[in-house]
Every structure is written in C-alpha cells, then in structure tokens.
Amino acid sequence: MNDSTIFVLIAIALAIILIAILFTFVPVALWISAIAAGVKIGIFELVGMRLRRVVPARVVNPLIKAVKAGLDLDTSRLEGHYLAGGNVDRVVNALIAAQRANIDLSFERAAAIDLAGRDVLEAVQMSVNPKVIETPFIAGVAMDGIEVKAKARITVRANIDRLVGGAGEDTVIARVGEGIVSTIGSQNDHKKVLENPDMISQTVLSKGLDSGTAFEILSIDIADIDIGKNIGAELQTDQAQADKNIAQAKAEERRAMAVAKEQEMKARVEEMRAKVVEAEAEVPMALSEALRQGHMGVMDYMNYQNVMADTDMRDSISKASGTKEEQHSKNDPRNRNVDK
C-alpha cells in the first residue's frame, strides 16, 4: 500500500468523524425541517442552543407550529421561556387555541401563567368551554333544628387576567359551601328550602363569590338536596342528659353530706353517753363523800336506793309493754293486709 492510498483513507476517516460530529452537535435534520416550513433560523443558531444546553427540538418544533398558525414569535423568546423552566410547547398551543377562539392572549401573559404553575392551555380551553365543578354534600341546619344536605354544580369559566395570583377551585368550592350553609341557616323552616332549592343558588350567586379567584362563576345549580338529622332534638336530648347527670351528682353530694352528718351525730351521741357513764361513775364517790361528811344520813341513802329501784322497775315495765305491742301489731291480720 503506497502513501497516497493511506492518505486517502485517513482523509475519508477524518471526513466521517467530522460528519458524525456535525450531525451530533448540529441538528441538521431539524434545521432542514425548519427551512422547509419557512422558519428563518441559522444552523449556527442551533449550535448555540446546543452550547447553552437547550434542546433545539423543544424550541424549533413549537416555533414551526407558531409560524404555520400565523403567530409572530421568534427563537429568542421561546428559548428564554425554556431556560426559565417553562413548557414552550404548551404555551404555543395555548396561543394557537386563543387565536382561533378570538381571545386576546399575548405571549408574555401566557408565559407568565405557565411559569406560575397554571396550565395555560387548559385555561384557554376552559374560557371557551366552561367547566362544571361538583361539590360534595354540604350540610346546613335550619332554625327549626333540622339538618339539610345540598349538593351543588358550579359552572365556571377561566378568567385569564386573574390566573396569576388568583385562587383556585378549592376556594370556589369553600365559598359556595359557606354560602349554602349560611342560606340554609337563615331559614326559619327547613321545608322552605325543600320547596324552593333555587333560592339557595340565587342567594349564593348574588354574593359575588368569584372575586379574587381565577374563575368567573356563571351559574350555581342545586343538583341534589336531602334531609339529615334532627340536630335540634339531639341537642335538647344531650342537654337533658347533662342536666340529669348534674342533678344526680348534686343528689349524691347531698346524700353523702347527710350520711356524714348522721355519722357525726352518732359520734356525738356516743360522746354524750360516755360523759353520762363518767358522771354516773362519780355518783357513788359523791354519796360516800356525803355520808362521810355528814351531809346525808342513812335514811336518806335508803330513800335514794328505793327511788332508783322504782325507776329501774318502771323502765323494765315500759320496755316490756312496748315489745308486746310491737309484736301484737305485727301479728294483727289487718296490718298484714295493709303491708301487702
């Protein structure tokens, strides 16, 4: 093999390597597609995107769609939105949909909505085709104590001007629920709510609940209404039970105080008895002292003994007669019938 042949082979190899590098760093196929679609973009501009770590297809393909749709966009704005973390394809689709629906939406507004975390394409579609939000059953209590449950369907349309910074669906549902509860609670009779459910939707809709939200409420319709519990009766029952428990506690307290008082009186009786016994024990000593000092004679002492004997006899007789009367009363048939 001569030197000229080796040189040719080396040249071919270098050419292949250069072509591979060119097709790796320069999306030639994408550039050809853009040129064919009428998009003016230079091949070195695509190389610059590669160097800036931008996927050229993420910018060029949406640009092709925008040009075909008649939108006035350029690569610099699309590339800037991509570098900011936005979804270029979704923004372009939203702009195309807005143009077709005659909605005034600029690229800057669409990019801001996209960067705010909102789905700008869904917002445009919702502006054309309103969305229906269905709430769960919301319970309210009328003034007569009856619980009324209502489910509402909220028809909303996206307000593109308030998508950035506006509240979402949860806020709309919460506000509508608050309005339903307030409307039901202001009625004297729950039957009025059942007879005219449209009253709820009219009252809630007139409150301007969509202020500060990203939506415009078009209508509020009551989809279902039902009767719940008798909250008033349950509250009265609970109150009666609480009053009963309080009364029982107070009665138990009084009973405990009465028992304590009774025990105290028994203790005092025993104390008095002990004093009586103590005093009786001092009587013989006093008698002996009186006899010793001559204050009492023998006859006086004998009279005292007779009086004590008579007293003991009377006590024995009275106790015996009381026992017999009690036994006779128990054995009387008339008393038995009364007991029965």
Swiss-Prot record:
The segment annotated Disordered runs over 314-340
Q: Name one Pfam family in it.
A: FloA
Which compartments is it annotated to reside in?
Answer: Cell membrane; Membrane raft
Q: Which UniProt keywords apply?
A: Cell membrane, Membrane, Transmembrane, Transmembrane helix
An example Gene Ontology CC term for this record: plasma membrane
The record gives the membrane topology as:
Single-pass membrane protein
Q: Which family does it belong to?
A: Belongs to the flotillin-like FloA family.
The name on file for this protein is Flotillin-like protein FloA
Please report the organism this UniProt entry assigns to the protein: Shouchella clausii (strain KSM-K16)
